Swiss-Prot record:
It holds the Pfam family tRNA_m1G_MT. GO terms for cellular component: cytosol. GO terms for molecular function: tRNA (guanine(37)-N1)-methyltransferase activity. Specifically methylates guanosine-37 in various tRNAs. Belongs to the RNA methyltransferase TrmD family. It comes from Borreliella burgdorferi (strain ATCC 35210 / DSM 4680 / CIP 102532 / B31) (Borrelia burgdorferi). GO terms for biological process: tRNA N1-guanine methylation. Keywords: Cytoplasm, Methyltransferase, S-adenosyl-L-methionine, Transferase, tRNA processing. The gene is trmD. This is tRNA (guanine-N(1)-)-methyltransferase.
Length: 239
């Protein structure tokens, strides 16, 4: 998969591709990337890419021309173009799985008040929000999306990890608690079942704890889980 990022500040993005698991994925040929500096496509002598909004209001808006030139520079018939914005559809693990099946993802990083709507109308396949909050940097949102997608690609991480983690394809629950050495930390001991070696009991304990955590922290996901399994198995639907 190729990630292409259009940004006014590509230096924010670059280190992510040069470290840790992402670097290994690139070395294996699983992932490639291109960083496009939108300023390089500005016709303004000062390389400005923003202007005042029509209709008035606070802040500046990214101009259509440099972004359109940058997008046309990215030659690929198989690209999926994404603009990250608080006004977009809410991002989810399900959408991350869907995007992981694409061949190339092009991400437009927003700044200031946003971008000219005509870019969204003409070029964007998905306008996505990573949550109900506002960031000053679209680059941070881009890193969230990239990280959530590339880790789902074959050969990046252990596929069994994807089954058990939060929002996993197995059941959609939040992940169960984890413990490691020491056995006793400040008077809190590791649950005995995890030391028993009894795999069926451990599996059942983890499911129970995952359900409890999901019910407590994300009741919406818990109700969705109950709909999927078609029963509550003793877990009532009341708060």
């Amino acid at each position: 998969m190729k990630f292409t990022v259009l940004s006014l500040f590509p230096a924010i993005i670059k280190p992510f591709f040069e470290n840790s698991i992402m670097k290994k994925a690139i070395n294996k040929g699983i992932v490639s990337f291109e960083l496009v500096d939108v300023r390089d496509f500005s016709k303004d002598k000062h390389k400005r890419c923003d202007d005042l909004p029509y209709g008035g209001g606070a802040g500046m808006v990214l101009k259509a021309e440099p972004i359109s030139f940058a997008l046309e520079h990215v030659e690929s018939a198989k690209k999926t173009t994404i603009f990250l914005s608080p006004s977009g559809i809410k991002y989810s693990q399900e959408l991350a799985y869907s995007l992981s099946k694409r061949e190339e993802i092009v991400i437009i990083c927003g700044r200031y008040e946003g971008i000219d709507q005509r870019i969204i109308d003409l070029y964007v396949d998905f306008e996505i929000s990573i949550g109900d909050y506002v960031l000053s940097s679209g680059e941070i949102a881009a890193l969230v999306l990239i990280d959530s997608v590339y880790r789902l690609l074959d050969g990046v991480i252990n596929p069994n990890s994807l089954l058990e983690e939060s929002f996993g394809v197995k059941n959609g629950l939040l992940e169960y608690p984890h413990y490691t050495r020491p056995y006793d930390f400040k008077g809190i001991k590791v649950p005995e079942v995890l030391l028993s070696g009894h795999h069926a009991n451990i599996k059942n304990w983890r499911l129970v704890k995952a359900r409890e955590k999901t019910k407590k922290n994300r009741y919406d996901l818990y109700l969705k889980y109950l709909e999927i399994i078609g029963e509550d198995n003793g877990f009532d639907k009341k708060n």
